[in-house]
Amino acid sequence: MKWLKKQAELYPQKQFLNDSTFAQINQEVNKMAEHLAPLIDNQSRVALLSENSVEMAVVLFALLGLSKEVLLLNRHLTEYELADQIKELKIDKVFTSDLLTEKVTDSISFSEIWTSNPCPVSLSADFPDEKIAVIMNTSATTGKFKSVPITWGMISNHVKASKETLGAYDNDNWLVILPMFHVSGLSIIMRTLYNATSATVVDKFDENQLLEMINSGKINMVSLVPTLLTRIADKLHSNNLRLILLGGEFIPQPLIKKCQELGLPIYKTYGMTESFSQSVTFNILDFPDKTSSVGRPLPGVEIEIRQADLAGVGEIWLKSPMLMKAYLGQKPYGTAFETGDIGYLDTDGFLYLLNRRKDIIISGGENIYPKEIEDLVYSLPEIKECALVAKPDAKWGQVPILFVSGNISQEKLENFLTEKLAKYKRPQSITFMDELPKNASGKILRKELKG
C-alpha cells in the first residue's frame, strides 16, 4: 500500500478517515495484516462483506497489502445470492463485519480476526498495473452476474484523472454515504488516499445527520444519486460545499435547474463499474447552457458514437486506461468498450445520454426514450420519483407504462401527459407507489417494475 505508507510518512497527523489520522490508519492496517496473514496464507482471492465503516477500510487495505484479490460483496444480497457468488469465484475465506457474519456460513468476523495469532508480515508497496485489486459483481442482461476485475492500473489512472478534473485541496472532506462495496463508494476512499485529503464514512443515509455535517462545514464534498439529492437540495447551504458529484442514474432536468438556481456546485458524472467510476464529468455552474449533458471526458478518456443516425445519435463506446480489459472468465472486448447506452456528442465534446439501450421502448416500430417522458413527469412539483418501463403487447410489441411516487391525482397526471405527449408515447397505465424499488446505491430497479 504505497499511497498509505507515503501519506502516513508525509502527513502523519492529518485526518484521513473519520477521526483517524493517516498514521493511525497505517498502524491499524499493519496490525490487522499480522492477524490476517495466518488465516489466508494460501489464498490468492478472498471476499469481504461489510456495511460502510472505517474498520471495513482497514480490513480491505490490509488484504490488499497482503497482495490478495478481494471480492467486495453486496450486503443487501440474500444468503443464497451471496453463496452463489462465493462459490462461482471459488472463494474459501470470507471476512464479514460483526453485524453481517450470519449471512455467510463459516465466515470470519472482524472481531474474530483479532483473536488469531499474529504473524509478522511486510506489506507490498507496489503492484503491477495488471494485478487485480478488487472484484465487483455487476448485473447482466442475462440475469447472471458478471465479475468486474478492478486492477491497480485502473485505480491509479482513475485517481490521477479525477484529481486533474475535480482538484484536491487541503481542507477537502468527502462524505462517503454510498456503499464502499460499490465503485461509487470505493472510488472516494481511493481518491482520498491518493490526494492525502479526508473522508467521513457513514453507514446509511440520515437526512438530518447529512444536513448537519454539510451546513456546519464539517464536510465539503459528497457523492449522491438523484433520489437522495431531491430530498435535501432545498435545505443545503451552497457556500459550505465545494462539489456534489451526481450520477448513478438518469438525472431529472428539473432537479438540475433547481440546483442551478440554488447555486449548488453539481458535478454531473457518467461512469460504470467497468471503468472504475466516472469517465465523464462537469460542473453545471461553469457551463449553464450544457446542463442536459453529462459532461466532457476525463483526461485519457475517448468517446465514440457508433452506428449513429442522421442526428448523430448512436451507441456510446469508451476507450480509457481506467477500463477493465475483460470480465473475469470472458474474452477481452478489444480496443473499445460498448457501454450499452445511447447518446451523442455536441460540437464542444460534451456527451448527452439519452437512454440505456436496454431501456428503450419500441412500440409499433417507434422508439420511446423513457428519459424524455420521465423528465416531463418530473417537471410536476408533486412528483417525487418516476420510471417508465416497457410492457409486452400483442399488437404493438411493447407499450410504455409509468410508475410514480408523489402527491398527485391520476386524472391530473393523465391530462398533463395527454396534452404534452404524442399518443404512442403516452403510458398505457399509471401505477402509484409509496416508493420505487432501488438498489444499494440508490438506482431505481426498473426490472422490478412490471405491469
UniProtKB/Swiss-Prot annotation:
Pathway: Quinol/quinone metabolism; 1,4-dihydroxy-2-naphthoate biosynthesis; 1,4-dihydroxy-2-naphthoate from chorismate: step 5/7; Quinol/quinone metabolism; menaquinone biosynthesis. Belongs to the ATP-dependent AMP-binding enzyme family. MenE subfamily. GO terms for biological process: menaquinone biosynthetic process. InterPro entries: AMP-bd_C, AMP-bd_C_sf, AMP-dep_synth/lig_dom, ANL_N_sf, ATP-dep_AMP-bd_enzyme, MenE. Keywords: ATP-binding, Ligase, Menaquinone biosynthesis, Nucleotide-binding. CDD domains: OSB_CoA_lg. It holds the Pfam family AMP-binding_C. It comes from the Bacteria. It catalyses: 2-succinylbenzoate + ATP + CoA = 2-succinylbenzoyl-CoA + AMP + diphosphate. It is an enzyme of class 6 (ligase). The keyword Ligase applies. GO terms for molecular function: ATP binding; o-succinylbenzoate-CoA ligase activity. This is 2-succinylbenzoate--CoA ligase. Its EC number is 6.2.1.26. Converts 2-succinylbenzoate (OSB) to 2-succinylbenzoyl-CoA (OSB-CoA). It comes from Lactococcus lactis subsp. lactis (strain IL1403).
